[in-house]
Amino acid sequence: MAGLKLQAVTKSWDGKTQVIKPLTLDVADGEFIVMVGPSGCGKSTLLRMVAGLERVTEGDIWINDQRVTEMEPKDRGIAMVFQNYALYPHMSVEENMAWGLKIRGMGKQQIAERVKEAARILELDGLLKRRPRELSGGQRQRVAMGRAIVRDPAVFLFDEPLSNLDAKLRVQMRLELQQLHRRLKTTSLYVTHDQVEAMTLAQRVMVMNGGVAEQIGTPVEVYEKPASLFVASFIGSPAMNLLTGRVNNEGTHFELDGGIVLPLNGGYRQYAGRKMTLGIRPEHIALSSQAEGGVPLVMDTLEILGADNLAHGRWGEQKLVVRLAHQERPTAGSTLWLHLAENQLHLFDGETGQRV
């Protein structure tokens, strides 16, 4: 068991432009951290730096209180699970799981014990003699994880391990990964572009954008209190509604570009007259009535999702999505009267994009 620390780590390919800006992260012993962000945000590069597969330009990496910044990958005490299973097709499941230990010179008895235990944990006991071609995608991924488990690493590194699986298998493997971490309690750093994976697996999430950690927090924190416009727009499906406008002179209302005026929950007078963005999640908008002071929205389209429905409309040029109950199915062109929960409104600075 070990902790992981990244201290002001940067990466530059040309010595000028930083693709990873100075980034500091403390991962507690046994903690499961997920790095999530769009393609090209730097999350896989950062993971490879921790693994020793990419050189750190500046800063330091520590594993178990030992500085490993220049250390060879094999000496860092890490095990990595990739997007591609990378199994040897001519070897059995048992041989694939044992191979890394064999080339390290571990004794046969110890190898057999470790493989047996990993197979038991991953429910691969009855598949040890099979070849990869005889396995399903989920079983192959479990073999790849078993190959990492037998090494008994200080830190697990996962690089989008579920992205090659179909939707149903991904759900199953997410649950298996949760159970695996609860059992092993090994420090883990996991990379994905899938926010559902991030929210369901992580104890803490690091949302990355353009080589910067926009926010580090629990899944609940990043969902309920996004630190920036990027986090607000990236986390959540559908994304948070983001509406541009200004706070009125009294700080009591938000005036949207397009004439709609929304009440604020007070305390915003210091932002009077400033260009701001107001955010609210679709589930925090309720159906109301004109008599109750509801705000009108002409619905353009309705998405029927089964458990609930999504109504789409516009206030001027600004799009709005409202999550409705399963039984609510208004027709296109009808007017919805809406109430926005004032205690669920988020304000972001119009220039910096940061939460205020």
Curated annotation (Swiss-Prot):
<feature type="domain" description="ABC transporter">
    <location>
        <begin position="4"/>
        <end position="235"/>
    </location>
</feature>
<dbReference type="GO" id="GO:0005524">
    <property type="term" value="F:ATP binding"/>
</dbReference>
<dbReference type="GO" id="GO:0001407">
    <property type="term" value="P:glycerophosphodiester transmembrane transport"/>
</dbReference>
<feature type="binding site">
    <location>
        <begin position="37"/>
        <end position="44"/>
    </location>
    <ligand>
        <name>ATP</name>
    </ligand>
</feature>
<keyword id="KW-0547">Nucleotide-binding</keyword>
<dbReference type="Pfam" id="PF17912">
    <property type="entry name" value="OB_MalK"/>
</dbReference>
<dbReference type="InterPro" id="IPR008995">
    <property type="entry name" value="Mo/tungstate-bd_C_term_dom"/>
</dbReference>
<dbReference type="GO" id="GO:0055052">
    <property type="term" value="C:ATP-binding cassette (ABC) transporter complex, substrate-binding subunit-containing"/>
</dbReference>
<keyword id="KW-0067">ATP-binding</keyword>
<dbReference type="InterPro" id="IPR012340">
    <property type="entry name" value="NA-bd_OB-fold"/>
</dbReference>
<dbReference type="InterPro" id="IPR003593">
    <property type="entry name" value="AAA+_ATPase"/>
</dbReference>
<keyword id="KW-0997">Cell inner membrane</keyword>
<dbReference type="InterPro" id="IPR003439">
    <property type="entry name" value="ABC_transporter-like_ATP-bd"/>
</dbReference>
<dbReference type="InterPro" id="IPR027417">
    <property type="entry name" value="P-loop_NTPase"/>
</dbReference>
<dbReference type="GO" id="GO:0008643">
    <property type="term" value="P:carbohydrate transport"/>
</dbReference>
<dbReference type="GO" id="GO:0016887">
    <property type="term" value="F:ATP hydrolysis activity"/>
</dbReference>
<keyword id="KW-0472">Membrane</keyword>
<comment type="function">
    <text>Part of the ABC transporter complex UgpBAEC involved in sn-glycerol-3-phosphate (G3P) import. Responsible for energy coupling to the transport system.</text>
</comment>
<dbReference type="Pfam" id="PF00005">
    <property type="entry name" value="ABC_tran"/>
</dbReference>
<dbReference type="InterPro" id="IPR015855">
    <property type="entry name" value="ABC_transpr_MalK-like"/>
</dbReference>
<keyword id="KW-0762">Sugar transport</keyword>
<dbReference type="InterPro" id="IPR047641">
    <property type="entry name" value="ABC_transpr_MalK/UgpC-like"/>
</dbReference>
<dbReference type="InterPro" id="IPR040582">
    <property type="entry name" value="OB_MalK-like"/>
</dbReference>
<protein>
    <recommendedName>
        <fullName>sn-glycerol-3-phosphate import ATP-binding protein UgpC</fullName>
        <ecNumber>7.6.2.10</ecNumber>
    </recommendedName>
</protein>
<comment type="subunit">
    <text>The complex is composed of two ATP-binding proteins (UgpC), two transmembrane proteins (UgpA and UgpE) and a solute-binding protein (UgpB).</text>
</comment>
<dbReference type="GO" id="GO:0015430">
    <property type="term" value="F:ABC-type glycerol-3-phosphate transporter activity"/>
</dbReference>
<dbReference type="InterPro" id="IPR017871">
    <property type="entry name" value="ABC_transporter-like_CS"/>
</dbReference>
<keyword id="KW-1003">Cell membrane</keyword>
<keyword id="KW-0813">Transport</keyword>
<comment type="similarity">
    <text>Belongs to the ABC transporter superfamily. sn-glycerol-3-phosphate importer (TC 3.A.1.1.3) family.</text>
</comment>
<keyword id="KW-1278">Translocase</keyword>
